[in-house]
Amino acid sequence: MEELQGYLEKDRSRQQHFLYPLLFQEYIYALAHNHGLNGSIFYEPVEVFGYDNKSSLVLVKRLIIRIYQQNFWISLVNDSNQNRFVGYNHNNFFXSHFYSQMISESFAIIVEIPFSLRLVSYFEEKEIPKYHNLRSIHSIFPFLEDKLSHLNYVSDILIPHPIHMEILVQILQCWIQDVPFLHLLRFFLHEYHNLNSLLITQKKSIYVFSKENKRLFRFLYNSYVFEWEFLLVFIRKQSSYLRLTSSGTFLERTHFYEKIEHLQIEHFVVVCRNYFHRTLWFCKDPFMHYVRYQGKAILASKGTHLLMKKCKYHFFNFWQYYFHVWSQPYRIHLNQLSNYSFYFLGYLSSLLLNFSAVRNQMLENSFLIDTITKKFDTIVPVIFLIGSLAKAKFCTVSGHPISKPIWTDLSDSDILDRFGRICRNLSHYHSGSSKKQGLYRIKYILRLSCARTLARKHKSTVRTFLRRLGSGLLEEFFTEEEQVLSLIFPKATPFILHGSHRERIWYLDIICINDLVNHS
């Protein structure tokens, strides 16, 4: 436990005292958008009620100046109380909702500044080139291809929820020693909860956030997940023979945050002393790997089934004792990798076993040696994608293409552009699939849906419309993967295109998941 205590207290200088003076200064506008922050991977444009970036940021700057004005807070609280107990007032409700959104944007911008600058300085110190490529969702799949083929068991974890708002504030208290900010954040969360807009409830996952306030709540969610992932980092460091100095994690914004090596958790030591000091031995597995995505996580290991069951048991106790969250057993599924397929970031992933026989000749005797090789395989989940297309009104639940009536008011070029963009994005994202036949079916549905939409607009049949304009009209807007490959590898096209339906390609420019892919 002395080692754990030192691990927690080694770097207390990382605690932040930044917010108290900044809230009283107008220059936060310039500080939040200096060259270092705009160039970092933390930066995202602020989008507020459809305003452009310049207008919305001006509103953020003005709101920061008004945050501590007494009349503003009294008006905001009175408006929210009137809406709850007196009746619905559209103007007051809109004003309260608008200011709540602006406050959350202000919080998010301010609180990201030190973490962003620290991350940029870290990459400059380590001289890591092209770290923007680490943002790509596809960058995690080569890691899985390299590691999972050597492992035996995988635990599919659904991160527990809900998490109480007060616990979220306490988590930030470990990082930020600014009392006014914590009180202000607590007040805002409670008022926002009273307006029934905060989506941290028992019926909805903490991963699903309000569209209007997603920036702040993503930060709070990442703080919550970072807290319980810290235990994995500590145990991994204790069990690893190499004693790794750092580890990385993909957060929900698909940005690559470098895991902070030291995290100050005051009462975490008490929990570990009372419970985990007898059980740290169970994770002494040098082949344990952890990946988190979309409110879920995968914990894979080369250990035995008994070891993984112990990990599952201690996860439940950790969530219960530390976060006061009751987690049901169904939230962790333990399976053997060779007999299990799991949905992961838009792909149906599994571990394939290839059996082969090798004839060995020794003097006059010959015998066969059976060998087994493992391969990490990713395919397109056709059924799920068809369900997403049906939900978006591109086809029926059985996969029969239908027209998109809501788009018939657009011009022909806009209709073709929309369908073509969706088709190209899906092809680009699922380029890592080992079997492209399912992707061809999705393309066929989109093409025929596009043709039906155009025919409906011109009050004609699909056959008549295509006969008049030619079937090549659609080909221009649906770039095939082979054409993309020929542009990337012009000199090696014949070799690459041979069997291209089986080739897997991972791109380093995919930083978000298409809504049609993100159906989980």
UniProtKB/Swiss-Prot annotation:
Regions annotated as coiled coil: none
Subcellular location: Plastid, Chloroplast
Keywords of the record: Chloroplast, mRNA processing, Plastid, RNA-binding, tRNA processing
Pfam assignment, any one: Intron_maturas2
InterPro entries from the UniProt entry: Domain_X (IPR024937), Maturase_MatK (IPR002866), Maturase_MatK_N (IPR024942)
Gene Ontology cellular component terms for the protein in this record: chloroplast
GO annotation (BP), single: RNA splicing
MF-aspect GO terms: RNA binding
Recorded superkingdom: Eukaryota
Described purpose of this protein according to its UniProt entry: Usually encoded in the trnK tRNA gene intron. Probably assists in splicing its own and other chloroplast group II introns.
HAMAP family xref list: MatK
Family membership noted in the UniProt record: Belongs to the intron maturase 2 family. MatK subfamily.
PANTHER family per UniProt: MATURASE K
Protein name per the record: Maturase K
Taxonomic source organism: Beaucarnea recurvata
Gene name, Swiss-Prot/TrEMBL: matK
